């Protein structure tokens, strides 16, 4: 009898543990999805200034118009400098292309390359929602912060893992560390300057990054005119790359 009771107690404890573990995982996933929606609508347009800062203080700036649809379609158009004007990039899931006027058909690019140089790579510039590319391995909380440990869904994702610090009260990301599969820190992303973009969208307007691989270099992304907008599927095709300016 005692043996049966002990077995039942162990079984009950095991079930409760499994339930708690499952609930914790679901909470982490739900928080990450809320972070994505707090940062931007699923389909939107925006303008960005990207600034590369070298150790000697020299700066190079780019202005981009960007449109996104659903979870995995994004396109960006270079507006300045004049040497880059008219170039456009397309992302469909894990696939990316660069179009250069008067050069010919679009060329394939990778997530770890950078169309602008600097610390931001193509995955940073054409970034999808975090929950599309990553799963939540673990979540903890301390004070006013959640700490999410994220794992890439597949090997084509630029970073094998992320460590994300999220503010509890706003569910906005504050700091994100990006890691290679070896565990090496590739870069750190820091969000700053909360701004009201309208229609209930209140989020950071500045993203800064640095990397131990590029000591002394820094890149900054400034967001403007971020708003929800719907687009036709034909916009996110190779044939449309020369016509992205018509969206503005």
Identify the residue ranges that each predicted region occupies.
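N-terminal post-signal-peptidase region of extra-cytosolic proteins
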Residues: 75-84
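N-terminal signal peptide c-region/cleavage motif recognized by signal peptidases
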Residues: 20-22
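Extracellular or lumenal secretory-pathway regions
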Residues: 44-45, 70
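Flexible, processing/modification-adjacent segments and terminal tails
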Residues: 25-43, 49-51, 58-60, 83-160, ...
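Bacterial N-terminal signal peptides that target proteins for export
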Residues: 1-11
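Gly/Pro-enriched, hydrophobic low-complexity segments
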Residues: 127, 143-238
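Sec-dependent N-terminal signal peptides of Gram-positive bacterial secreted proteins and lipoproteins
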Residues: 14-18
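Extended lipid/amphipathic-ligand handling interfaces
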Residues: 35, 64-68, 190-198
């Amino acid at each position: 009898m005692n043996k049966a009771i002990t077995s039942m107690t162990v079984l009950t404890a095991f079930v409760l543990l499994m339930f708690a573990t499952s609930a914790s995982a679901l909470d982490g996933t739900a928080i990450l999805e809320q972070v994505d929606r707090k940062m931007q609508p699923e389909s939107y347009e925006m303008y960005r200034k990207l600034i590369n800062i070298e150790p000697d203080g020299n700066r190079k700036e780019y202005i981009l118009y960007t449109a996104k649809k659903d979870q995995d379609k994004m396109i960006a158009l270079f507006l300045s400098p004049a040497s880059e004007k008219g170039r456009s990039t397309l992302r469909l899931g894990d696939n990316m292309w660069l179009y250069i006027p008067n050069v010919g058909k679009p060329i394939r690019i990778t997530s770890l390359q950078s169309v602008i140089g600097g610390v931001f790579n193509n995955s940073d510039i054409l970034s999808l929602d975090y929950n599309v590319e990553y799963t939540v391995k673990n979540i903890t909380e301390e004070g006013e912060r959640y700490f999410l440990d994220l794992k890439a869904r597949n090997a084509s994702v630029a970073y094998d893992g992320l460590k994300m610090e999220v503010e509890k009260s706003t569910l906005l990301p504050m700091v994100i560390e990006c890691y290679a599969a070896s565990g090496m820190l590739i870069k750190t992303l820091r969000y700053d300057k909360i701004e009201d973009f309208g229609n209930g969208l209140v989020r950071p307007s500045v993203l800064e990054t640095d990397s131990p691989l590029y000591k002394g270099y820094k890149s900054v992304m400034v967001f403007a005119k971020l708003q929800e907008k719907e687009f036709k599927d034909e916009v996110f095709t190779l044939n449309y790359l020369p016509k992205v300016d018509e969206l503005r």
